[in-house]
Amino acid sequence: RRHTRYPLVTGVQTCALPIFNLDKMIVPFRRTYSDFEAWANNQKSVLQEAYLKSLDKYRTYKKESIKTVNYLAKEFECKKAADQYHRANTANTGVLDTQKLHTFKWNEDLFKKVTTIPDGKNHGLVFYLDWSGSMSQSMVPTLKQLYDLIWFCKKVGIPFRVYAFSDASHNDHLFPGVVAAEKLNDVHIDRSFRLLEFFSSRMNAQTLDKMMEYMYYNCDSFHNSNGSYNYEYSLSGTPLVETIITTPQVLNKFKSEEKVQKVNVVYLSDGEACHPQYNKFITSMNKIYGQPMYGDRICVIRDPKSRYQRKIDLDKGITNAFVEYISNIVDANLLGFRLCSKSEVRLQASFAGIDTIGTVDLNREWEKNKSVAIKGAGFDELYLMALPKTSYNPYRYWNPQEKQTDNEIVVKDNSSKSQLTNAFKKHMNGKMINKTILSKFVGQVA
């Protein structure tokens, strides 16, 4: 057979999902908080000015986000109530309605009715945060999105977990243990792969706020020469495939702990996963090594439990293929968030399997809302959102004359009253994340 990317295909390689040791794979929030607390205390004494400046940014953003969080909560309650009403059931009670007795000659329905509205499902949210080097420039904007969603969860009482996925080489030394056994023909898992639990609904309010403060300074330091990030939690590659296939076991653990029925899984990343591998025995080395899933064979992933299997097609995007695979074996909404520029919309649409001709409407929506929501990308919904104008500019240090407009109203000299009014409205509208995307996201959660 001929393959679109590799001309000679000699056979089919069937791979299975590995069984993860969650106790070794997940670094619990008590450990991550302890590490960041010790690191932050040192930063306060060594780089006090930089830390206080970052702390002021965090507190300012938290205050500004009240409007966004309140909007999210209101939308959630409305959509949840609408869903409950939609599932309402009206039935006869068996008791005569005395006010209808006079209609007995032409009306057969003389009984009182009762409408039953079923209890809403318990909701839960699991977030996966891309902790890769390519995220450094957009980590703070992504973190802000995440913080809004965390505060939303706290306000409406939704249990949540936030895991940063990392395969930094020192993880195996800092957090020792075997994550997954090297079983022949299983999807290969790097020995340094870990899920770092940064935030959890099981944190008390003070601990959660402190961790958010520490993390804001840490992420701000990725591109700020005045600060210094935590090297023990440095950015790594993009083990998104490994993260996606942990979802079934992580969700089972989460549902068991929180007793929730409906779970939404959110992947916050900046693009494609690294190339997947499978465990293959190398005779010359007498050892199992990870081998690329592409080459002279077509790979099929099989879930031993459900027996569901799917061919992995690189031409349709690695991330999309694995997300679509997992969506068939878990009972959850799988959602993706991506901060990107306008030029990346077409690229992301192609990764989503959308014909590039059809991106005309996406471009129009982007121009109008600075965001688009895509379906049919493996995810239940994939959200592409514009990078804030105040996000990291890699050329800032080369152009000292460039002005930063963070939290500033920019107007020209001698502006008219109407120009000042419009500038103020534009500034205030920018304080709130796009309502269209928020409404769609809340609709999925509710």
Predicted regions and their residues:
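Acidic, glycine-rich A-domain
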Residues: 1, 5, 12-446
